[in-house]
Structure formats: structure tokens, C-alpha cells
UniProtKB/Swiss-Prot annotation:
Disulfide links within the chain: none
UniProt organism field: Prochlorococcus marinus (strain MIT 9313)
Catalytic activity annotation: [[Fe-S] cluster scaffold protein carrying a second [4Fe-4S](2+) cluster] + N(6)-octanoyl-L-lysyl-[protein] + 2 oxidized [2Fe-2S]-[ferredoxin] + 2 S-adenosyl-L-methionine + 4 H(+) = [[Fe-S] cluster scaffold protein] + N(6)-[(R)-dihydrolipoyl]-L-lysyl-[protein] + 4 Fe(3+) + 2 hydrogen sulfide + 2 5'-deoxyadenosine + 2 L-methionine + 2 reduced [2Fe-2S]-[ferredoxin]
EC number: 2.8.1.8
Entry-linked Gene3D superfamilies: Aldolase class I
InterPro entries: Aldolase_TIM, Elp3/MiaA/NifB-like_rSAM, Lipoyl_synth, rSAM
Keywords: 4Fe-4S, Cytoplasm, Iron, Iron-sulfur, Metal-binding, S-adenosyl-L-methionine, Transferase
Pathway as given in its UniProt record: Protein modification; protein lipoylation via endogenous pathway; protein N(6)-(lipoyl)lysine from octanoyl-[acyl-carrier-protein]: step 2/2
Identification of the protein by name: Lipoyl synthase 1
One CC-aspect GO term: cytoplasm
Cofactor binding note from Swiss-Prot or TrEMBL: Binds 2 [4Fe-4S] clusters per subunit. One cluster is coordinated with 3 cysteines and an exchangeable S-adenosyl-L-methionine.
Subcellular location(s) per record: Cytoplasm
Superkingdom of source: Bacteria
Amino acid sequence: MTGKALLKPHWLRVKAPQQQRIGEVAELLKGLNLKTVCQEASCPNIGECFAGGTATFLIMGPGCTRACPYCDIDFDKSPRSLDPTEPERLSEAVAQMNLRHVVITSVNRDDLSDGGASQFVACIEAIRQRSPLTTIELLIPDFNGNWDALAKVMGAAPEVLNHNIETVPRLYKRARPQADYMRSLELLYQVRQGWPKVYSKSGLMVGLGETDAEVIEVLEDLRRHRVDIVTIGQYLSPSPKHLPVDRFVTPEQFEYFRSMGETELGFLQVVSTPLTRSSYHAGEVQRLMAAHPR
């Protein structure tokens, strides 16, 4: 990871966060011993999301069995056993925060036979029991292509299923050496084929070395695999030890990706801005579901 770092452009500046609300949410999460991807992955939107009383919960962590060189979550080849109290603690946080829409994601757990699918199910069931009106979005790993594990998760009936494609296929060996582009596409297709009422979602980063043409090709692939919602955001390197930023994509180009995806390719929604992350403003999906009921 060498080379001079690019200077961050002005459009990547974020508003000063509301420290009081951030502190309140952080204290709640600490008290319940819960992690968020907002904190663990150094998300630039943490101030806005915490100030709005929302968070994307990270389960089965903190260590991840994969070591993707763009990601700020710690690698752990032998992570701790799953915590059976985690689902109940998560449901308590959702209830206390009075969330209308909750996003749950996880680290990769390749050490588990089902990749952690059972823990996702337990979390959904706990939330349904305590907060039955809250809609649930899952951001899942690829389960190493274990479609039985996927079926287990989908059987718990989340409203939205997200699996991020992350980058263009040419960069997989460099950025996602333990993942497979076609496997991720197949997972997304399986979701729409087997559970057509569920809204499928995926996301990718730009600035890792891809071209604009390659981004469009990924969008075309995602649409062919019947994905409904796509997020596109700027990659920001967490540290000098991680993959460097290759380019900063302009807001105008992000708008082009959005327009192409929605008007030409027919996605229900493309959220494409420099600061977009896969669960940024995820609560807006409720309006999308109301406009396109299934």
C-alpha cells in the first residue's frame, strides 16, 4: 500500500455531528454490549445517523474471518463463540430506540457451518416479538455459497435482503480475495427467485481502481439478477495499511450512475452520492415499499 495519498475533495466534508445525541446512542449501545458497523468500520455518516437515532447493528463480531484489504473491521481467524444473549440485547436496543426500520449486518463467520445464519434468524425473531411493526433489513455475507443457510435466513422473512457486490469483477482478486463475484450475483438471484416479495438490494464502492464503464457493467449484471435497490458510494481508505483511494468520483458522475440505473436499467431505487453507504438512509426504504407494494 504505497503511493502519495490523494487530497480529499470538498464534497466529502460532513456536517459537524450533534454530540449529545451521539453520546446518548453510544451509551445505550455500550450498556447493551452491542456493536455497530457505524463504529467498527469508521463510517463517515456516523454523526448524522446517530443524531437521527438510527444505527446498523453488527452481530457475531467483533472479529471477521476474512481480511478484505479495504475494510476496517478486525480480522480474526478463530473468532469467539456466538453469544446466545445477543438477539435479546439487540431487540432491547431496537425497542429503546423506537426504530421503525432496523438494519442488521454481520462479520463473515466462515468458521461456522451455516455462516451464522441461525444467529440472524434468532435476531429477527427477537425483534418481531418485541417490536412487531419494525421492518427489518439484513446485510448478509455470501455464506460461502451455502444456499441452505440463505434459505434459513429468508425463512425468517426480512423485508429487505442486502448483499453487497462491493466492486467490479476485475478488482475482486485484489480487494475481495476470499469472495467470488458470480457467487454474489447468484445469491442475489436466489433471493428474488425464491422469495419474490422480499426487496433485494446490493451496493458497491467506487474509487478502488475501476472505470465508469465497469461500474455500468456491474449495474447491468445486478439488474439482470433482479436486484431492486442499489447503493453507490466513494471508497475512503481507513488507514495507510489499507488499499489506497485510486480516484475521487465527482458528485456529477454519481448522479449519472443514479440516472442510468433508474431510468435506463429500471432499478426501483439507486442511491448514489459520495457519502452513500449501504445502509445510509435505509429507513427511506419504507416509502419505497409503500410505493411498490408486493
